[in-house]
Design a protein with these regions (language model features):
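Active-site helix of classical SDR
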Residues: 150, 186
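Rossmann-fold cofactor-recognition segment
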Residues: 73-93
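Residue(s) in the substrate-gating loop at a strand-loop-helix junction
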Residues: 170
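Canonical Rossmann dinucleotide-binding motif of NAD(H)/NADP(H)-dependent dehydrogenases/reductases
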Residues: 4-54
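SDR active-site lid
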Residues: 203-323
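Conserved Rossmann-fold cofactor-binding substructure of NAD(P)-dependent oxidoreductases
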Residues: 89-104
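Conserved mid-core segment of classical short-chain dehydrogenase/reductases
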Residues: 117-136, 179-182
């Protein structure tokens, strides 16, 4: 993890600004959302905290942590008047923006931090109607949700000729991870969307920053749902590729109190563990022959340490006059992305001649290689294209 147990929590830093800013958080009851809200409220800014009503009303640890945060807001002088809670899901984006503007007159910073993880290989996620629905839900939560709230806030920020959109992503936006294919796909889709609209909104003085946190941030601080495993992808059947399910299962299995919350299932329901010792140490929640959903039961202290670097980066970047387009949190994340880029660069160089051989060459004296298809006169291609389409060649 990016944060060791002994690493000190960094002191919050904020960019210079002339007046308090208004932040809109899309997942105000998440550990990241709560921590950012505390920091910016303490700094003197305003917070509009979006929550899903059903999640707030249940009895989960997550809802209890948010209720504890609200109690702290009431006790702390000056916080209550600068916090507004609004219902927010994929159907309520326009209403949330309107409520924020009505109460605090503007939205300066939109922080998209809504996420959940679907665990399973592509075959496991194609095995039933239920798992196919999980895939659709993954994109609804991780892609269409952020896309809709971003789309809703742009007209307001455009009218102000000012604004900053921050999207919390992960290094999985650079790195494919076995067992997290749909999680990675939804993240890559969101980053592609953000990279594109950043150019569209730049003339309106609206900035957009993608913050890529470690994979632990996105997975361990949000809801996890796993599809039933297939035996063909277990080590018992000789599957040698690393699989995120096994890594996450082992980590969750070591969390204090996990056995009390989730008693071990019968041995026949376990697919992944490869030894009797592992089976006896269960419960291996994510390897059961059923769909399993849970929030990892991390302690408050562990969670604070885990997210500290990311929260520090968010407060330092939020509302900055010249923020980065992309920020990678933590030295481990930077090293992983550098290694991926190095591999891509090496493969590019290895096959550069093959790439160049596909360029279109103009015929005639004194005519060199065209740098791209766009450099070629369309008339030079019309005959070939139409002949090919008619089956004449």
């Amino acid at each position: 993890m990016a944060n060791g147990a002994s690493a000190p929590i960094p002191t919050p830093q904020f960019p210079t600004h002339n007046a308090p800013r208004v932040w809109l958080l899309t997942s105000g009851d998440s550990p990241i959302g709560i921590s950012v809200a505390k920091q910016v409220l303490d700094h003197g800014d305003y917070v509009v905290s979006g929550i899903i009503q059903a999640d707030f009303e249940d009895e989960s640890v997550r809802s209890e942590e948010f209720k504890s945060f609200l109690s702290e807001v009431v006790r702390t002088n000056g916080w209550k008047d600068r916090l507004k809670i609004v219902p927010l899901d994929i159907r309520q984006c326009q209403a949330a923006i309107a409520e924020a503007v009505h109460v605090f007159k503007k939205v300066d910073i939109l922080f998209c931090c809504t996420s959940e993880a679907i665990i399973g290989t592509v075959e496991e996620l194609s095995a039933s109607h239920r798992t196919l629905t999980m895939v659709r839900d993954q994109f609804e939560k991780n892609f269409f949700g952020p896309m809709n709230i971003i789309k809703a806030v742009i007209p307001h920020m455009r009218a102000l000729m000012n604004g900053h959109i921050i999207v919390l992503a992960g290094i999985t936006g650079h790195l494919g991870t076995p067992g997290l294919s749909m999680y990675c796909a939804s993240g890559w889709a969101l980053e592609g969307f953000c990279d594109s609209i950043a150019y569209e909104i730049a003339p309106f003085n609206i900035k957009l920053t993608i913050v890529q946190a470690s994979v632990e941030i996105g997975i361990l601080t949000n809801k996890i749902t796993s599809a039933p495993p297939m035996k063909e992808y277990s080590r018992d059947f000789g599957h040698t590729a690393p699989n995120f399910r096994g890594l996450l299962d082992g980590l969750i299995n070591r969390l204090p109190g996990i056995r009390a919350q989730y008693p071990p299932p019968p041995e026949r329901e376990i697919q992944s563990p490869s030894s009797e010792a592992e089976r006896q140490s269960g419960p291996y929640l994510l390897s059961r022959n059923e769909v399993v959903s849970l929030y990892p039961p991390l302690s408050h202290a562990h969670t604070e340490k885990l997210i500290a670097e990311t929260v520090h980066a968010l407060t330092a970047i939020g509302g900055h006059e010249n923020p980065p387009a992309r920020h990678i949190v933590g030295v481990e994340g930077v090293a992983s992305v550098k290694e991926k880029l190095k591999t891509v660069s090496e493969e590019l160089e290895e096959f550069v001649d093959t790439s160049a051989s596909a360029d279109i060459v103009r015929q005639g004296p004194g005519v060199g290689r065209a740098s791209s298809v766009m450099d070629v006169d369309i008339k030079d291609l019309e005959g070939d294209v139409f002949d090919a389409s008619l089956g004449l060649r």
